[in-house]
Each structure stands twice: as structure tokens, then as C-alpha cells.
Amino acid sequence: MTIAQTTHGPVEGREKEGVLLFSGIPYAAPPTGPRRFRAPEPHDGWKQTRQALKFYPAAPQYPTGGMTAAVPVRWDEDCLALNIATPAIDDARRPVLFWIHGGAYRTGQGNVPWYNGAQFARNGDIVVVSIN
């Protein structure tokens, strides 16, 4: 396991085939309750190491079948999270590819296998970030 320091607190990721993967890192407060249908608010952060080993749920959406039907999907309003693939945690200044999935505001998520940025991170020496 690998620990990375973020502005919100430490996160624990995993190494797979030469790439460090961090999944399900919240980037905003959950958009639930009084925050529902409002602009995102900052996340309070955490003091203990947070596991970033599995994807966060996708935003609620109408099930359309199509490409995402091949992958089991968990939906929840608490879905604002990042997935990060990086070759290393060091002082190197790498380019960042920030991937926003398609779906015409009706479907889609950053958690599907074909959006996995590990190969880009490994072969291109870049950091890949996807979001939900």
C-alpha cells in the first residue's frame, strides 16, 4: 500500500503493474440534504489515513444500457470523487490529464474500466485524473 498526502488529508492507494492507483477521493462535501441542487462546497477533510482503494458511486442517472451496462454500477448522490493514476509520488513535475467522461449529462461515470488511466500513466509518465 502507498500513502499520499493531499490537502484534505492522507490517502492510501495501491500499486498495480508499476502504477500507483488512488480511487474514490472526495473533492467536495457530499451534495446531500441541504446541499442538494446547490453549488459544491469544500470537503472538511480527514485526519486519519483514508483508504482510496475502491471507486465511489456514480451520480444517479437513468439506466440506459449501452456501454455502461457491461459494468455493475452503484449510484448515490454522494458521488463527487476523483480517481488518480500516477507512475510515482516524487518531486517530478508531470503533465496531468484530467479526464471528464461523456454521457450528454444523462449517463456516464469515471469508474468504468475503459477509462482506467494506468496505461497512460505508466507509458506516458503522466498523472491521470478522472472524476464522477
Please place each PLM-identified region on the residue numbering:
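Non-catalytic accessory segments of hydrolases
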Residues: 1-131
